[in-house]
């Protein structure tokens, strides 16, 4: 268990805890002007009941992961966060008190917000917000049976994107797809003609802090794929992924990009 639940910073480092960048000192919570605080925040006493809890994760200004945890409750609570197993002790957090309308009835709610630079977060890791009684100071490995928790998977920082580039002479094409949760299967086609798999190579870059997977596929045109006029020379890249719907991305080259002979 940790010591005092009143805030401040830990003096004993934890080997597997997330570590912030020394430059990340912003903070929107006026209660914590230094932008650093424990992952535990004590809130006032409110009526007893099992709180309702909602959790959302989004990207803020491209560089930050922002998680927001809303707890509807009238009881005294300690709110804390975990990313994976470690507690989130050193990143910018803030709690605000507000009232929400639920079925036309105003309810008391607490909103805890966590901001972490994406470079300190590995996408697809579980993030958890826990609302615990004030007499329980939860930490790493603490039993959370008496807490109300909500977990979700941290998404990729951005939406999946696919770009196709042509060489100056038009005899090579490169397809780069980013923000992938795992390596997909790629097929190339020109018009309605599917190209043989022995004509291209691909490189996979796995998930890293702040970045989901990237697949780079390169195709060299070694023979004409068929009698196609310039308006029909459309490159299609089809990526199939087990956990995502099938996505088809087409590239319509400008006249200066069109190969004279494929």
Curated annotation (Swiss-Prot):
Which keywords are on file for this protein? Glycoprotein, Membrane, Transmembrane, Virion, Virulence
Q: What is this entry's stated membrane topology?
A: Single-pass membrane protein
Q: Which InterPro entries match?
A: Varicellovirus_Gp2_glycop (IPR010278)
**Intracellular or extracellular location(s):** Virion membrane
Q: Does the keyword Transcription regulation apply?
A: no
Enumerate the transmembrane spans: none
Q: Where is this region: Disordered?
A: 1-45
One GO BP annotation is: viral process
Keyword Glycoprotein included in the entry's annotation: yes
Q: Which GO terms describe its cellular component?
A: membrane; virion membrane
Q: What does this protein do?
A: Virulence factor.
Mind telling me what this protein is named? Glycoprotein gp2
This chain's source organism reads: Equine herpesvirus 1 (strain Kentucky D) (EHV-1)
Q: What is the lineage of its organism?
A: Viruses, Duplodnaviria, Heunggongvirae, Peploviricota, Herviviricetes
């Amino acid at each position: 268990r940790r010591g005092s639940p009143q805030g401040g910073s830990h003096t004993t480092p934890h080997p597997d805890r997330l570590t912030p960048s020394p430059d990340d000192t912003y903070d929107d919570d006026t209660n914590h002007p230094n932008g650093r605080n424990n992952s535990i925040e004590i809130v006032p006493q409110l009526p007893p009941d099992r709180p309702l809890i909602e959790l959302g994760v989004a990207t803020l200004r491209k560089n930050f992961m922002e998680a927001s945890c809303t707890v509807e409750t009238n009881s005294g609570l300690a709110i804390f966060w975990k990313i994976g197993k470690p507690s989130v002790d050193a990143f910018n957090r803030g709690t605000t008190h507000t009232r929400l309308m639920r079925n036309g009835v105003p309810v008391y709610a607490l909103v805890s917000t966590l901001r972490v630079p994406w470079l300190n977060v590995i996408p697809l890791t579980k993030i958890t917000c826990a609302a615990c009684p004030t007499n329980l100071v939860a930490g790493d490995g603490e039993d959370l049976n008496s807490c109300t928790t909500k977990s979700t998977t941290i998404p990729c920082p951005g939406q999946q994107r696919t770009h196709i580039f042509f060489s100056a002479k038009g005899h090579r094409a490169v397809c780069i797809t980013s923000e992938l949760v795992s390596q997909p299967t790629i097929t190339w086609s020109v018009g309605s003609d599917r190209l043989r798999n022995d004509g291209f190579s691909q490189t996979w870059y796995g998930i890293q802090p702040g970045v989901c997977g990237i697949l780079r596929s390169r195709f060299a045109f070694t023979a004409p794929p068929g009698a196609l006029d310039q308006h029909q020379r459309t490159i299609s890249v089809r990526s199939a992924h087990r956990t995502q719907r099938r996505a088809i991305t087409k590239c319509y080259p400008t006249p200066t990009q069109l190969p004279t002979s494929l």
